[in-house]
Every structure is written in C-alpha cells, then in structure tokens.
Swiss-Prot record:
Divalent metal cations. Prefers Ca(2+) or Mg(2+). GO terms for molecular function: actin binding; deoxyribonuclease I activity. Belongs to the DNase I family. This is Deoxyribonuclease-1. InterPro entries: Deoxyribonuclease-1_AS (IPR018057), DNase_I (IPR016202), DNASE_I_2 (IPR033125), Endo/exonu/phosph_ase_sf (IPR036691), Endo/exonuclease/phosphatase (IPR005135). It is found in: Secreted; Zymogen granule; Nucleus envelope. The record marks E35, V89 as: Involved in actin-binding. The gene is DNASE1. Pfam families: Exo_endo_phos. It catalyses: Endonucleolytic cleavage to 5'-phosphodinucleotide and 5'-phosphooligonucleotide end-products.
Length: 284
C-alpha cells in the first residue's frame, strides 16, 4: 500500500511539473455524467480534481439536458478564480431519445476559442447518417505552445459501429481541413477502439489508421479502463507536422486516477469506467 501511495504521489508531482511547463489536453468519458454524479460530493470532488489537471479537456457521455450538471462543474472548477475555466458544449446528440453532449473545458489564460461547428454527417431521420454522436469541433488559438492553432475533434463511438465510425473520422478530418485551411488537428475520445469492437484484422480497413498522415499516440496495448478489462478504447490521434512535432515525447497516456489518488476499485469505477487519455504540447 505504501508503494502504491508513493507511486501515486510521484505521478501527481510529475503531472504538476509537466503542466507548469506546457499545455496538457485530455479526453475523458465520464460515464453518465449528469446531475446525479455532480450531486455526489465524493464523485464530484474527484471529477473536478481530475479535470483540473488539464488546460483543454473534452468530456464525453454528458447526459445533461438542461446543463445543470455542467453549471455545477464550472462553479466548482472556478470557485477560487471565476475565470479559471470556460466551456463550449454541443447540442444533445443521438439517433433516439438517448442523447449525449460533448463538453469542451479550457483555461482562457492558456488558449482561446477561434471557432466551432457541428459536423454534418447526413440525415438522421433518413437513416443515412454516419455517427451515432457526430463530432462537434473546436478551433483553438494557443499562444504559449509551439503550435499556435489547432482543432480538436472528439468522438464517442457507438461500440458496435466503432470500425465504421473511426474510419469516418478521416472524412471529418478532411472537412476540418477544407473549412478552416488547417493541418494541425487532434482527434480524440472514446473510440471503442479495442477488444471485441475492433479486431486486429479490421485495422487495415480504417483510413485513420492506415494513412501515414496520422500519429496514434495511445497504443493498442494500453488499458484505458478502470474495470477488470484491458482495452485501449480511448485514443488520441494527431495530424499536421507542427502539431506532431509539438507533442512532448512519451506524454500521451491514460491517467490512472485510481493509482494516482489511492482509490479503491469500487470508487474508481463509480467515477467512470474509463480513464482520461492525455497528451502534453511543448511550450514555444
């Protein structure tokens, strides 16, 4: 137990030191994030502690139709500084009555939002749309890092459609390129890109994987889950030479908050069944 606590303390210290020197981004699928979770003092405490590590974070599985939980989250993040975090949130997304939002949290003293838009993947009532939850895309200006502008494309893929949705991210990438004349793009989130949802034989049919323009920063061998499974569901993919050069070597990884904070397995899973995946960009 002492060894686990020491490792957790070292991870936390390393995170603080690295965060002071660069820009840290993450994608975090917080299972069923809504009013119930934010009303639980213990769970909300750790969610805020985790998200406070990041300068830019994309939260997935936001189940908050009236943005009440999002408001509570921002109030807590900003309790010591009312401008510590700002946010951009998508409309509720989904083909049925079940809807989720993408939530972008960012520190305005580190980055600013230049533009945003909702990707149009087709007609949902017609049954010819591509994504269960089509990406909402944000373009950031980052004056403190080597790369000054980049876009973030999130995806929470439907598990049974993971192969098709990950492949279709290539089309989203092209759309962002064309719309903003921008090469430096981060695609990240819970792609469900592992275990039974993407077989080894299927990777060759996924353009986002086979095209050498893309660097996959989270390897297939990673475990991004807090449960007993060992699956690399959550990924970070970067495109654009400036952005790829700006990535701090070996900074991309899942953040195991169970180890870092010395939590029980039960509490860790109550926070979420996923760990955040994170990456750090070099300062200019």
């Amino acid at each position: 137990m002492r060894g686990a606590r020491l490792m957790g303390a070292l991870l936390a210290l390393a995170g603080l030191l690295q965060g002071a020197l660069a820009l840290r981004m993450a994608a975090f699928n917080i299972r069923t994030f809504g009013e119930t979770k934010m009303s639980n003092a213990t769970l909300s405490k750790y969610i805020v502690q985790i998200l406070s590590r990041y300068d830019v974070a994309v939260v997935q599985e936001v189940r908050d139709s009236h943005l009440t939980a999002v408001g509570k989250l921002l109030d807590t993040l900003n309790q010591d500084d009312p401008n510590a975090y700002h946010y951009v949130v998508s409309e509720p997304l989904g083909r049925s009555s079940y809807k989720e939002r993408y939530l972008f949290l960012f520190r305005p003293d580190r980055v600013s939002v230049l533009d945003s838009y909702q990707y149009d993947d087709g007609c949902e009532p017609c049954g010819n749309d591509t994504f269960s939850r089509e990406p909402a895309i944000v373009r950031f200006h980052s004056p403190l890092t080597e790369v000054k502008e980049f876009a973030v494309v999130p995806l929470h893929a439907a598990p049974l459609d993971a192969v098709a949705e990950i492949d279709a991210l290539y089309d989203v990438y092209l759309d962002v390129q064309h719309k903003w004349d921008l090469e430096d793009i981060v695609l990240m989130g819970d792609f469900n890109a592992g275990c039974s949802y993407v077989a080894a034989s299927q990777w060759s049919s996924i353009r986002l994987r086979t095209n050498p323009a893309f660097q996959w920063l989270i390897p297939d061998t990673a475990d991004t889950t807090s449960t007993s499974t060992h699956c690399a569901y959550d990924r970070i993919v970067v495109a654009g030479s400036q952005l790829q050069h700006a990535v701090v070597p070996e900074s991309a990884a899942p953040f195991n908050f169970q180890v870092a904070y010395g939590l029980s397995s039960q509490l860790a899973q109550a926070i979420s069944d996923h760990y955040p995946v994170e990456v750090t960009l070099k300062r200019a």
